[in-house]
Amino acid sequence: IPYKEYITDFAKDNAKLTGTEKDNLKYAHEEADKFLKESSGVVNYLVKEFEMKKNAQLHARTTISKTGIIDPLKLHSYKFAEDIFKKISSIPNQKNHGMIFLLDWSGSMQRHIMPTTEQLLNLVMFCRKINIPFSVYKFVNNSEFDTHGKNTNHPKAPFVLTDKTPQCDQSTRLVQLFTHKQSKSDFKRSAQNIYRSAMYFGGYYDWRNPDHIRVPSIHAKYYMSSTPLNESLIAMDTILAKFKSDYKTDKVALVTLTDGSANSVSTKKGSRMAIKLGNKYHLCEYRWRDEKKDLTYHLLEYLKKKYRLQTIGFFLVKKYQELRYSFHVPYKKEALARSMFNKNKFIPDYSTGYDVYFYV
């Protein structure tokens, strides 16, 4: 779904609001505008840091955690984004670099959706400032609709399925939120829409926060559902090819912001799933504590090899205990890992299909 359609759908719904609903919409937009204004100073600082790193004769720099400008202890704060900026700054020519973001829009993200949205908006503003090609999508699979927001009986489907292909979720949609080609006004509208959505859904888990009641509901086809990450990575094969062709990028960074593993993808007639990497076929099957066998891992490996892709993942949690089924460390290092996470509020993992996977 292109960003123009996303903006238009919200505008049509907004036109139907009456009375108090209009006041509540104004409140949501004002909150979004306030955040963008407050964040502009921090983004400008990060841009300055980026330019310093590009300049070979400037060796000294003040780390973000010591400036006082950015709070390194804030969940999903700029300290975590700095690792992304380091990836960008390692490229000699920024104009030949691009970024694609995938935002998890599943129901379980409600607890994290506001800080995640704020983090995403800061990254988008940063990319706009340094003028690199980028595109931002949220992946959803609202079962009421297909990719065009029609009834599920609508004949058009995103995947061509046969008995020999993975049985991907046909309700999967990639909603484009932002792109470097957006006008300033369209960027603002998209930012207001996603911020309002985060206010609305985030209120479900916070009884002290009246925003769920106060903020108007959003268009039905943009509601939260589950996590079609694998389907989204399959779609990236098409999106990345066009992105690299259109913008002549030498390097592309793919960043996912999620709170857990992908939905499973089944096969027909009990067949086993495999993906071809180079001259070899690799079986894709779920094994507990062995992510290197699953479909997500192999899809990332496929995309990295085909597109010279850098991959960065963010896994969002409230506390270290939530990592017990995802982040696996030797028993003797468990106490150290817990201590690092509690101190820094994040911990990196280099053993997944991503180049680096941050548990935040």
Question: Model segments located where?
Answer:
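Acidic, glycine-rich A-domain
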Residues: I1-V360
